[in-house]
Amino acid sequence: MKKYLLSIAALLLCLLAHSQEADDLGNYAEFSIIPRLDVNPLFGAEPEFTLGNSSLYTLFEGSASEHFSWTVASHWISWYYPDEFGLETGALYKGLGYSDSNNLFDFLKADLSFGNWTFTLGKDCITTGGHEYDDWDWLVHPQLASPLWNDLACYQWGGKVAWTTPSEMTTLSLQMTTSPFGERPFGSGLYTYSAQWSGDYDWYSPLWSVSAFGREGSEFGSAPRDYSFLVSLGNQFLLGDWTVTLDWTNTAGLNDEYSDFLAGNTFHGSVDYAPSDRWDFSLLGNYILPKKGGPVNWWNAGVIAHFFPLRDSQDLRIHAFAEYDSLLGGFELCAGILYNLTFNLW
């Protein structure tokens, strides 16, 4: 894997040297600081108060030419339980050098584009498919995300090659990354292989993928390495101000030991309505159906409202939602604010 990454890095440097001879189209750099604060009371069998997705992120992205671009997204603070600020935030830093959990760096990648081809090297999101992964983490309401989104250490080191048709309606991608089922990114010798089909066909946008996750051989198998296969079929329908999304994956989450996927099905759906640039509303939910022998079926559903008070800008977002979760046996409410403070460096 290291030789593979070094070879791609050498190729990218050669292509970058060539691209610098081109014009400066798309030459820019932006740095954003994104704080978010939530209040999130839960009402159920075990009532509690949390701070939801309260966090601090930064985003540094830009391009040196029309061919070369980069993205660095960092998660500096995580604050779910009011009295565990140091514990949760510290885990982001302690996780550096490990691949079985997300840590300080979500994205740390470079992209080179030539014609219809794009080459990516660095830390990236596993190409798992499903429109649930379209948004940045700081925009998401984890309480209404699927078990896969919440549990999978999806940011891994590797490389990807993507080809887009001349019409720009279809993109096919192949990716190789370290495996989230290995403790160390390269020392474990475990890797994930993914293929994805992404489309933009006027009113319909598919995002389908299949991934083979390398993991240690099970106690019932004879091979020192096994693979768990994740199939994800994301479907999005655009109907004027309305967007309907339905994602399906062939897993009900991850087991307690984080060594394999739980067999089953997860249906993640949303209906979004955006009547203007300053308001959007969503109905969103999940239905998790484990196979025989797994945990019980459960579901959740909620209503979300986003308001953007700044004229001609969505940098400031005020949000709220109400949700019922059958696993918790109760309701939860959330209200919060998010601000994207962006500096144009060049």
Name what the model sees in each region:
Residues 303-309, 330-346:
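Outer-membrane beta-barrel "beta-signal"
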Residues 31-41, 72-76, 121-123, 172-178, ...:
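Transmembrane beta-barrel strands of outer-membrane/channel proteins
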Residues 50-56, 101-106, 113, 153-157, ...:
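Residues that define the transmembrane beta-barrel architecture of outer-membrane proteins
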Residues 39-47, 78-84, 127-131, 167, ...:
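Gram-negative outer-membrane beta-barrel proteins
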Residues 66-70, 116-119, 167-172, 201-208, ...:
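Repeated loop/turn-to-beta-strand initiation elements of outer-membrane beta-barrel proteins
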Residues 169, 193-292, 299:
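Detector for outer-membrane/organellar transmembrane beta-barrel domains
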Residues 5, 17-35, 47, 125-127, ...:
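Outer-membrane beta-barrel biogenesis signature
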Residues 31-44, 85-104, 118-196, 335, ...:
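Surface-exposed coil loops of outer-membrane beta-barrel proteins
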